[in-house]
Amino acid sequence: ALKCRECGREYPLEATHVCEFDFGPLEVAYDYDKIKKTLTKDALSKRPQTMWRFRELLPVAGEPTVGASVGYTPLIKADRLAKWLGIKEAWVKNDAVNYPTLSFKDRVVSVALSRARELGFNTVACASTGNLANSVAANTASAGLDSFVFIPADLEKGKILNSLIYGSRVVGIKGHYDEVNRLCAEIAGKYGWAFVNVNMRPYYAEGSKSMAFEIAEQLNWKLPQHTVVPMASGSLLTKIHKGYQELIKLGLANDSQPTVHGAQATGCSPISAAFKDGKDFFKPVKPNTIAKSLAIGTPADGFYALKVMKETGGASDDVTDDEIRDAMKALAECEGIFTETAGGVTVGAAKKLIASGKIPAEDSVVLCITGNGLKTLDAVQ
C-alpha cells in the first residue's frame, strides 16, 4: 500500500503522492514477513546482476518492463582517494557508469516507468535539473512511450542535447528548478500524464534504495560505517537509509546502524545550513552553483533528510564551486573516475567531514557518485 509518512493512513497503489488528510507525502509500505520467505541470499545468487535482483523491495507488481538492465554498478575500493581524503578506507559507488544514461536517475526512472505502464499510462513527464530528463527521454524511447521533460532553460548544454536526441519534447522554462517543479505540479492532473516526480513520486523514489542494497551485497552484507550522499531534494539520502534498514529487518545485513551524511553545494545548501544551525526545518534558497543537478532550493525530502542524519549520528557539509572542481579533479586523478559536479560535492564534503572529525579518520566510508562528468564539461572548461 501507499502510506502517509506523517499520519500513517494507507492508500491503494495508484498514481497519487499526497495524503488527503494532512497533505503528508506518501511512500510505499511492504509486507516484510512475506518478503523474507523469497528474498534470500540463496535466491539472490541465482538472479541477474541488476537492481531488479531485489524486486520484492521495489513497487512493481510484475517483471520490470522498462530498464530491466539498470543498476549493479561497481563499488570500487579507492585507496589513493582515501589517502587524499585523510581516511583509512574509502569506497566509491560509481553510478557514473549506470545504464543507459550514466546517472543514478536510471534507477528511479526504471521503477517509475514500469509502474506507470502497469497503471495504464502512455505519456510520461518530469521536472528535472538534467539527469532525470535524460533518463526519462532515453527510457521512454526504448519503451515506446511519449514523453515531455520540463527543465530550467539555463541547464548545461550537454544535458539538454542528451534529452533532445531521444525524441522527447523538451520544454525550457525561464526560472530555477523549483519554479519548473511548481508548474509541473499544477499541470500534472490536467493532461492525464504520469509525472515521475509528482503523481508517480512514491514509486520513483523507491528506486534509490537499490543503491543501498547493492552497496551492502558488494560489501559481503556488512553495512558501511559511513555513507556520504549528495542532496538535492534529499530523497536519495532518505531512501539509502530506508534500504539499509530493510536489509536489517530481513536479516540479510548485519544489524550495525550505518551513519549517513549529506553533501550539498554552498550555492544551494538549505538542508546543510539547517543541520549546522541545529534546526529540524530548512529555509528555501535561490540556487547559485555549478552543481546544477543539485540545485533544488526547496527540497521535498529536506525535513526527512535532516531527521535521518540526526537519527544515525550523521552530519552535513557543503562545498564551494572551486572546492567542487578540486574534488572532481582528485577523484579523476586518484581513481580514474570522471564524475559530474554532484560527485565533486560528495567527495569535497566528505573531505571536510573527515577533517572536522565528523567521520573519524580510522573508519571506512562509502561515497555515492551519482553521475558522469561528460555531462557537465562546462564546469571544468
Go through each PLM region and give its residues.
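PLP-dependent amino-acid enzyme catalytic core
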Residues: 1-381
